[in-house]
Amino acid sequence: MLAPGESVLIPAEEISLSAGDVISLSVHNLIASVSSYRPWWSEFLAFGSIDRPSSFSPAVSRVKLNLHHFAVNYVLLTAASITLFLIGDPMALVTVASFVAMWLLLYFYRDHPLVLYGRHISDRVIVFGLILGSLWALWFINSLQCLILGVVTSVLLCLVHAIIRNSDDLFVQEKDVVVPSNFLHWS
């Protein structure tokens, strides 16, 4: 029997989801993330907004803003570039695509802990396994040169786009806007 001032903490039951449920939720989170954060391609490829920056300082500010605003588009462009460079080696393409999918589903877009055979798998074990698997895959595919060329090409394309894309007509997120007010300012 408890005294009137005492309380007992009842542990909440942990929700254990199967590996299939975790992956299904991860796929759902991935699709929701890509569809909600990606600016439309018509905005990305707006030819009326392309001009040369006047100096180095505006170019740097354009790069910062465009990299932030078009981040998902640049990731998709990088994936397309890597795919084009690896298309000549289907085994390498399938291997890289499967490891990218594993990283996305098992690490980046997973909300709940992964449970295998009734045991929780920690994030450290998942990251360690994904890193080892990715390094093994890069060694196994023997197409590291094509992969590096794809990444370098996409980085150059993204950088050129970020420099020449005028960022004046981009929509500003409300949370990023700070409106200065002199309401409580005493001079």
UniProtKB/Swiss-Prot annotation:
Listed GO biological process terms: vesicle-mediated transport
Keyword Repressor recorded: no
Pfam families the record matches: PRA1
Domain of life according to the entry: Eukaryota
Keywords: Endosome, Membrane, Transmembrane, Transmembrane helix, Transport
Stretches that traverse the bilayer: 84-104, 125-145, 146-166
Keyword field contains ATP-binding: no
Tissue expression pattern: Expressed in roots and lateral roots.
Cellular component annotations (GO), alphabetically ordered: endoplasmic reticulum; endosome membrane
Listed InterPro entries: Prenylated_rab_accept_PRA1 (IPR004895)
Topological category with respect to the lipid bilayer: Multi-pass membrane protein
Compartments where located: Endosome membrane
Known function: May be involved in both secretory and endocytic intracellular trafficking in the endosomal/prevacuolar compartments.
Family: Belongs to the PRA1 family.
Identification of the protein by name: PRA1 family protein G1
Species this protein is from: Arabidopsis thaliana
Encoding gene per record: PRA1G1
